[in-house]
């Protein structure tokens, strides 16, 4: 493979050569076994094409600062084709097997959808060649139904039939690409599938339309023989004020309302969880409990900032708890950990792209190590079992097994004094649990 970057391939070095980040992985050792599986199998890391190849590091108040070697190509198609080479070398040097992309990440649009598809197919042809050459894989692909001005009021939920038709045609071609590249999953993120005001919105009709749209998408996938897992990615707001896939619970309710729960799982992002007022681990738990945990977009936000900043993950506490949920789920099946993340605006060099991905991979690898030890020692399991132990016998078991009515429950407690009711409760020992979690993090990672 040609050398486009003056950086060495990232390998596992542990902490023996010092603690400064950047020379290799301190915690991510791809072939090391964790609970009987290689770390690389638990952590199917993926590089996001849009942030890595296309992101200019703009913010709402300033132009982009990113300095990228492919900027030397002035012709849009020439640059698009060159980016494929840069992307695959980046994957190789980062020791990452997977990548993800939107259709519009790959190639410039033409004046018509036919022209746009032709541009896209040229780039996909090259991607397929590089995949065959390198063995790299597509974790998931998706379509951008939010960037172009035609999607001013949404794609599948647009109040304009022509735009809904265009959205369907764009998804159709994107699904055909998914089959060509053997994409393991196909993601729907409703960037503008929501509303700004109820004053001009038929909310019920829009949700019925997007449900119909999803059924049609699945029907077409079946028709062409594409078998990848369909995923929905929740987000509460931005760019719209109210998005229909607000959070995991709302999205699951939507899927069940419209009979889509057998065809879809969830792709959950850390920063989106914050915007919804939840922790990342909460969203993962909700999906896991529903049997609909599909994949993870590994990023984080700033809890002091109220918008989506897509920062590379560095919070070991959060990573540990998310990995704990993933292990409890038995892994992510066809899903993985896609870095839907970008360096900070002041981190504008190519070196920063390598360092940021290294940091994110090490953070989740460290979290996986701690989570595995927590599970092995049954730290939380034993506490939870004891906390709910009153439902194993007596009136609790009767309640659990549907053997009592409200009247019988009333008879049981009607004459119990307050002192007995208080005595039946137990301390949650939350401070002790949080401190224990800290101790596991310090101890496991200190080895």
Swiss-Prot record:
<comment type="similarity">
    <text>Belongs to the xylose isomerase family.</text>
</comment>
<keyword id="KW-0963">Cytoplasm</keyword>
<feature type="binding site">
    <location>
        <position position="233"/>
    </location>
    <ligand>
        <name>Mg(2+) 1</name>
    </ligand>
</feature>
<dbReference type="GO" id="GO:0000287">
    <property type="term" value="F:magnesium ion binding"/>
</dbReference>
<dbReference type="InterPro" id="IPR036237">
    <property type="entry name" value="Xyl_isomerase-like_sf"/>
</dbReference>
<dbReference type="InterPro" id="IPR013452">
    <property type="entry name" value="Xylose_isom_bac"/>
</dbReference>
<feature type="binding site">
    <location>
        <position position="340"/>
    </location>
    <ligand>
        <name>Mg(2+) 1</name>
    </ligand>
</feature>
<feature type="binding site">
    <location>
        <position position="269"/>
    </location>
    <ligand>
        <name>Mg(2+) 2</name>
    </ligand>
</feature>
<feature type="binding site">
    <location>
        <position position="272"/>
    </location>
    <ligand>
        <name>Mg(2+) 2</name>
    </ligand>
</feature>
<dbReference type="GO" id="GO:0005737">
    <property type="term" value="C:cytoplasm"/>
</dbReference>
<feature type="binding site">
    <location>
        <position position="269"/>
    </location>
    <ligand>
        <name>Mg(2+) 1</name>
    </ligand>
</feature>
<protein>
    <recommendedName>
        <fullName>Xylose isomerase</fullName>
        <ecNumber>5.3.1.5</ecNumber>
    </recommendedName>
</protein>
<comment type="subunit">
    <text>Homotetramer.</text>
</comment>
<feature type="active site">
    <location>
        <position position="102"/>
    </location>
</feature>
<dbReference type="GO" id="GO:0042732">
    <property type="term" value="P:D-xylose metabolic process"/>
</dbReference>
<keyword id="KW-0859">Xylose metabolism</keyword>
<keyword id="KW-0479">Metal-binding</keyword>
<dbReference type="InterPro" id="IPR001998">
    <property type="entry name" value="Xylose_isomerase"/>
</dbReference>
<keyword id="KW-0460">Magnesium</keyword>
<keyword id="KW-0413">Isomerase</keyword>
<feature type="active site">
    <location>
        <position position="105"/>
    </location>
</feature>
<keyword id="KW-0119">Carbohydrate metabolism</keyword>
<feature type="binding site">
    <location>
        <position position="297"/>
    </location>
    <ligand>
        <name>Mg(2+) 1</name>
    </ligand>
</feature>
<feature type="binding site">
    <location>
        <position position="308"/>
    </location>
    <ligand>
        <name>Mg(2+) 2</name>
    </ligand>
</feature>
<feature type="binding site">
    <location>
        <position position="310"/>
    </location>
    <ligand>
        <name>Mg(2+) 2</name>
    </ligand>
</feature>
<dbReference type="GO" id="GO:0009045">
    <property type="term" value="F:xylose isomerase activity"/>
</dbReference>
């Amino acid at each position: 493979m040609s050398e486009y970057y003056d950086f060495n391939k990232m390998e596992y070095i542990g902490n023996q050569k010092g603690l400064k980040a950047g020379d290799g992985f301190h915690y991510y050792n791809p072939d090391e076994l964790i609970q009987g599986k290689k770390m690389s199998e638990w952590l199917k890391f993926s590089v996001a094409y849009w942030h890595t190849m296309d992101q200019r590091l703009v913010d709402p108040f300033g132009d982009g600062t990113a300095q990228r070697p492919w900027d030397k190509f002035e012709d849009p198609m020439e640059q698009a084709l060159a980016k494929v080479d840069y992307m695959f070398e980046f994957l190789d040097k980062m020791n990452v097997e997977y990548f993800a992309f939107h259709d519009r990440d790959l190639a410039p649009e033409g004046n018509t959808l036919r022209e746009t598809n032709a541009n896209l197919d040229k780039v996909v042809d090259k991607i397929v060649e590089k995949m065959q050459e390198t063995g790299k894989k597509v974790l998931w692909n998706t379509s951008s139904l939010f960037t172009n001005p035609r999607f001013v009021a949404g794609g599948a939920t647009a109040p304009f039939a022509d735009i809904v038709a265009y959205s369907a045609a764009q998804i159709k071609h994107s699904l055909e690409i998914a089959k060509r590249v053997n994409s393991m999953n196909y993601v729907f993120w409703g960037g503008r599938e929501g509303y700004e005001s109820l004053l001009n919105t038929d909310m019920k009709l829009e949700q019925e339309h997007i449900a119909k749209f999803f059924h049609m998408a699945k029907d077409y996938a079946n028709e062409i023989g594409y078998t990848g897992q369909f995923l929905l990615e929740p987000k509460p707001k931005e760019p719209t004020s109210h998005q229909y896939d607000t959070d995991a619970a709302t999205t699951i309710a939507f899927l069940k309302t419209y009979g889509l729960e057998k065809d879809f799982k969830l792709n959950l992002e850390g920063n989106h969880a914050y915007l919804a007022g939840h922790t990342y681990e909460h969203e993962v738990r909700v999906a896991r409990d529903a049997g609909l945990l599909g994949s993870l977009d590994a990023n984080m936000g700033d809890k002091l900032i109220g918008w989506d900043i897509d920062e590379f993950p560095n919070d070991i506490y959060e990573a540990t708890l998310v990995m704990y949920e993933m292990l409890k789920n038995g892994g992510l099946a066809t899903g993985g950990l896609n870095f839907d993340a970008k360096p900070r605006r002041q981190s504008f060099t190519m070196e920063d792209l390598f360092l940021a991905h290294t940091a994110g991979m090490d953070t989740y690898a460290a979290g996986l190590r701690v989570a595995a030890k927590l599970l092995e020692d049954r730290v939380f399991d034993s506490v939870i079992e004891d906390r709910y132990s009153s439902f194993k016998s007596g009136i609790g078991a009767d309640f659990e097994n549907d053997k009592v009515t409200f009247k019988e429950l009333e008879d049981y407690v009607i004459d119990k004094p307050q002192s007995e009711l208080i005595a039946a409760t137990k301390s949650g020992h939350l401070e002790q649990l949080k401190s224990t979690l800290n101790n596991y993090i310090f101890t496991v990672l200190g080895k």
